[in-house]
Amino acid sequence: MLRWMTAGESHGPALLATIEGVPSGLHVTTEDLRRGLARRRLGYGRGARQKFEADEVSILAGVRHGVTTGAPVAIRIGNSEWPKWETVMSADPVDPSAFLIDAGTGDEREIARNRPLTRPRPGHADLPGMLSYDVPEARPILERASARETAARVALGVLAEALLEQVAGVRLVSHVVSVGAERATTSSTPTPADEAALCEASMRTLDPEDNARFEAAVDAAKQAGDTIGGVAEVIAYDVPIGLGTHVTARERLDARLAAALMSIQSVKGVEIGDGFAQSALLGSAAHDEIVRGADGHLTRTSNHAGGIEGGTSNGAPIIARAAFKPISTVPHALRSVDLATGEEAVGLHQRSDTCQVVPGAVIAEAEVALVLADALSDHAGGRSVGEMRRNLEAYLAVVGERA
């Protein structure tokens, strides 16, 4: 079983990520993490923060000479902007007079940074967080609720994808299928071999015409002083049959995937396979018939289920989609109430992206990888990569005799 968690604030000194249960013998390097984090920074419609803030990643524990040791893996992602925030975000008490000193910018930005944020933003964690945690302003809430935290999850996803590929040959790919009302028109489904092309495309799609329409939708939203959402799709190839279970609700693979994807900031909907569209079909057309393939093994005539039946992987590619609402930090500020004065106001505004669906696809891929790696560990667990491979091979040999 894998267990992971993250810590850190958006403008704190660093994000931390730890994961327990990673077997020994997994090949992973700091450069792998850098490449993974670089993918998260791509995309049309990103905000100014991506231009000046760097992900300073380092592995603190659990890896030696590029190979995991079996101990918990700890990762640190430093915040290159920390010097500008070390007074405002100090863990220790700060003399109020310190806030009257500039942050080396030659102006009073430090004062603005520390101004109480008492006008909660609609769509954010601000208001429920302030009330639930009994704090007078939104800074302690928004710092942790920020999507900046997903950088740590993407780093963990790099480890998960390495585990899936090195043990079971499972590989993942993600892409954007819609932006606002614009939907992809191409019927081609990307494979992991298309990763370089997807990274080169500003909207993470293989079709140039789709890419241009998606860009235009983002441009229109930005010009209107607004934000725009979209849908990202993740596909996992060569997933062995039998991951997950029908036995308990919390261990159903589709339930775990849905929970993981819904945990991403801005995600408001998840579907597996044909998802909501499947509800419009008759039963005779909605399910994937089982036939004997040319090689004598069982196969399917379609993949409406998205690779999961009864909470268990069925051997077909796993397909999951996440719907991202438009970012809540809207330049055209929405109405709110100042909790310090009780007066009507507009929600506070900080720099933000116009569209987050491209990095959202990369984050969704990381979440799917973590769930699948955990399910693989449950099914073929071992203390080393070699032991996991042997366990999986023995299981698949038995399955191959029957199906």
Description of each model-found segment:
Residues M1-A403:
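Generic N-terminal targeting/processing segments that precede catalytic cores or assembly contacts
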